[in-house]
A protein has these predicted regions:
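Glycine-rich loops and low-complexity Gly/Arg-rich segments
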Residues: 35-37, 63-67, 83-88, 145-150
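Short, low-complexity, polar/charged sequence segments that are solvent-exposed and flexible
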Residues: 28-34, 60, 78-82, 139-144
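Ligand-binding clamshell of periplasmic/extracellular solute-binding protein-like
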Residues: 60-73, 125
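Ligand/substrate-recognition segments at binding pockets and active sites
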Residues: 1-66
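Short, solvent-exposed loop/turn segments at the edges of secondary structure
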Residues: 4, 55, 70-71, 87-94, ...
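Tryptophan-rich aromatic "cage" segments
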Residues: 133-156
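Extracytoplasmic/peripheral linker and loop segments enriched in polar/acidic and small residues
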Residues: 39-48, 73-136, 156
Length: 156
């Protein structure tokens, strides 16, 4: 139909990191199979940072090192140091704040995060494992992928 517009996305990536540039190209190829037009903007460090800070992107490939307490505040809180492109008033951010204040539980936050999906982790450089007796998990995890069924974990 002539009146239909094709969905078009711009992915911003730092060209100085070959792994991230390759990831952006791979995502582009996958999305184009779904008939989504994708432009990958491979930028030098200075231009990349400026593009991300300005919000002139649909997606960006970035890297975040979480603090030892695994706080998502830099991503989900208003004024967070890496909250680029994230609606810090959205459902995930609101649920995270409620969880931190103790007025809501972890499952409610996870459900809101999954529905809102403010960011998508593409990979993890190193994994950690924690355990509490209240954690109930399936048996699909494996030594090479301890988070394989994280979406089914529950706290009781």
């Amino acid at each position: 139909d002539a009146n239909k517009k094709q969905l078009a996305l711009r992915i911003v990536v730092n060209k100085d990191n070959g792994f991230k540039a390759a990831a952006a190209q791979s995502i582009k190829e996958m999305l184009e199979k779904l008939k989504i037009s994708v432009t990958v903007s491979e930028l030098g460090e200075k231009d990349y940072r400026a593009a991300v800070a300005s919000g002139k992107f649909d997606m960006y490939i970035g890297e975040v090192k979480l603090t030892d307490n695994m706080s998502l505040s830099p991503l989900l809180k208003s004024g967070g140091s890496v909250a680029y492109g994230i609606n810090t008033s959205g459902a995930a951010s609101t649920a995270y704040s409620a969880f931190l204040s103790g007025s809501s539980d972890l499952n409610t936050f996870i459900e809101a995060f999954n529905a809102d999906m403010p960011f998508v982790p593409l990979c993890y450089r190193s994994g950690i494992a924690i355990y509490t007796r209240t954690l109930k998990y399936g048996n699909k995890n494996h030594i090479n992928d301890i988070y394989a069924d994280i979406d089914s974990w529950d706290f009781h």
